[in-house]
A protein has these predicted regions:
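N-terminal accessory segments that target, anchor, or regulate ATP-driven/P-loop NTPase machines
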Residues: 1-115
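Conserved C-terminal "switch" segment of AAA+ ATPases
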Residues: 80-84, 241, 303-313, 317-377, ...
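AAA+/SF3 P-loop NTPase mechanochemical coupling elements
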Residues: 240-244, 280-300, 349-353, 405-411
């Protein structure tokens, strides 16, 4: 009987007649629709078996695993990453070749595992919280901004609006990109570092555009290059530990106008494009998309005429006013001294700068400074020399401090004139401006 079945039934025809009732189900179990031809995973990494990811997790189906046993722990960590399965397939495929250049490949995996994929810092309040809690939070926002820097009320209102937008949208939409336009030393960085970053409880990473000479600084070098590393954007995410930090690009107008400078601007244009920045790729991690859509990008510059028109069109520019002499006096006595005291080892009140003395320093020693950067430098110089003198005692050389090292010390004009080398500071400022 079995012989007749084998003789009479052609290979394919017999099976079809035998399983007529299952025709509609069997193909669905064995076949899957062909992948789209423009899918980069299938262009560069052909996957003939639709269950390949399951095989990479459990082996090849015959109890074998292509990943060497000594890298099983690394494999498990990769499988836990918040990445799409197709991207995990691509990452796991690299494990097969680790031994060809072990140190370099392992470093690649270690850095990849440090990227905070889909890990977000939570907003301090939500729009569904109790109204009293929300109100208290925004009271704290105003207090934090006022403690960060003096004045700039219009700028602070813009930042409060920015924070409110993040709260109301629950950070699901990218808020407009803020750019601070103002003279050097007017407090742009302080307002962001001690203001916005503290209000949102998010880490902030600073990038000085004046020091960037190549776009690879931002988006890395290809893994194939010797000594290659990821760029500053990925390193910033790793350092901050979340995928929605604040990235502050200072001195945007210092980017060169050479071809390298244009490449740098193009990277920044890509970063700020809400259509593209959810698929940012570092050259070091080629093929691994990194979502930057939740990152808060903020820029600062002095000369608006040097900004790329395309990039400028995407920025909400806030003008930072130059402080008046009276505003500088308040900034010096209420803010700069309090910031410097603990850095040098003084308690608040050990060294006293009256408003009259602060005005004297401003008008006589840094009258050409539009911001307060030099004012801060002079206050720091005075404090450092007093700090040294109190340890040296009678051997110290400053006549204005003789017999006056009992705290609290009140600064007078003689001390300012002796402790601040006006000619040296003016010379330093002259040479500094040559390179701005």
């Amino acid at each position: 009987m079995s012989k007749n079945k084998g003789d009479d039934a052609p290979k394919n025809g017999g099976r079809k007649r035998k399983n007529d009732g299952d025709d509609t189900q069997k193909p669905n179990k064995k076949k899957s629709p062909p992948p789209p031809q423009d899918d980069p995973v299938h262009i560069f990494f052909p996957l003939p078996n639709p269950n390949i990811f399951s095989q990479m997790f459990n082996g090849d189906g015959n109890g074998k695993d292509d990943v060497p046993a000594k890298y099983k722990a690394l494999k498990e960590k990769i499988l836990k990453l918040n990445l799409d399965d197709k991207i995990k397939e691509r990452v796991l495929a690299r494990l097969k070749n680790v031994d060809s250049d072990k140190h370099k490949h392992l470093e690649w995996f270690e850095l990849l595992l440090k990227i905070p994929f889909k890990k977000y810092a939570e907003i301090p309040v939500t729009k569904t919280d109790h109204p009293d809690r929300i109100s208290k939070y925004f009271d704290d926002v105003y207090d934090t901004l006022n403690k960060a820097t003096y004045g700039m009320q219009q700028v602070k209102e813009e930042i409060v609006n920015y924070v409110a937008q993040i709260v109301s949208t629950e950070n699901k939409n990218m808020p407009r990109i803020i750019a601070l336009h103002g003279e050097a030393g007017v407090g742009k960085s302080a307002l962001l570092r001690r203001g916005l970053s503290e209000c949102l409880k998010r880490p902030m990473k600073n990038f000085s555009c004046g020091g960037i000479r190549d776009s690879a600084f931002l988006n890395g070098f290809s893994f194939t290059y010797s000594g290659s590393r990821p760029g500053a954007i990925v390193n910033g995410l790793i350092e901050c530990g979340v995928s929605n930090p604040i990235f502050f690009f200072d001195e945007l107008d210092k980017i060169s106008t050479t071809n390298d400078g244009i490449d740098i601007q193009n990277v920044l244009i890509h970063l700020t494009d809400p259509v593209q920045n959810n698929n940012f790729e570092d050259k070091y991690f080629d093929g691994i998309p990194i979502d930057l859509s939740k990152v808060i990008f903020i820029f600062a510059f002095n000369d608006i005429g040097l900004i790329s028109p395309i990039l400028k069109d995407r920025l909400h520019i806030i003008n930072i006013p130059t402080p008046s002499i009276q505003e500088k006096v308040i900034i010096g006595t209420k803010y700069l001294t309090k910031e410097l005291y603990p850095n040098i080892g003084f308690n608040e009140g050990d060294v006293v700068f009256s408003e009259e003395i602060m005005r004297y320093i401003i008008t006589q020693h840094c009258e050409h400074d539009k911001g307060v950067r030099n004012l801060k430098r002079y206050i720091e110089t005075i404090l450092l020399k007093i700090n040294t003198a109190r340890f040296i005692g009678q051997k110290q050389k400053y006549k204005s401090l003789k017999n006056k090292l009992t705290f609290p010390i009140e600064i007078n004009r003689d001390m300012v004139d002796e402790l601040v080398d006006k000619n040296k500071n003016e010379k330093d400022e002259f040479f500094r401006t040559l390179f701005i």
